[in-house]
């Protein structure tokens, strides 16, 4: 009986060693089950026809930023890595805004009230927008945060970065798009 349990455990571990890397391959998270290949591309044309609400309830059209380099950062107040990258994003926006770069924070938080209290405490100098269901349709499902999209002036996603971004990564991506 014990040897069967050991054999079953070994088989499960071997299967996990094969399946997990396959699931974590680049581009795997950009597709949801039942979605045709390429429907949620990590690179390619961004859907700028999306309208989201800001912390004050105002509608913000992403199309209004066409012609600018867009750093689109999906985050949440309860996310530790997101909180750590906020100073990087604040500095990035201050450094590049006069060169036609905009940083947009897309928050997964439930209420705008939460953000109106949080953003000033973190000295967030860039627009904060609220996540809506149609974001997933436009950019693919978000399975974890932070996720950062780098979008060129022509509206093309040049990179989708999962996890926190460093200052060096942001500078490299933005300079390539300027």
Go through each PLM region and give its residues:
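N-terminal targeting signals for export/organelle localization
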Residues: 1-49
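A short beta-strand-turn-helix
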Residues: 42-44, 49-70, 93-96, 139
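Conserved hydrophobic/aromatic "anchor" residues
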Residues: 50, 65, 74-75, 118, ...
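Conserved redox-active cysteine motifs that mediate thiol-disulfide chemistry
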Residues: 66, 74-91
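Hydrophobic beta-strand core positions in alpha/beta domains
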Residues: 71-73, 105, 149-150
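Structural microenvironment flanking redox-active thiols in thiol-disulfide oxidoreductases
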Residues: 83-122, 131-138
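Thiol/disulfide oxidoreductase modules built on the thioredoxin-like
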Residues: 117-125, 130-177
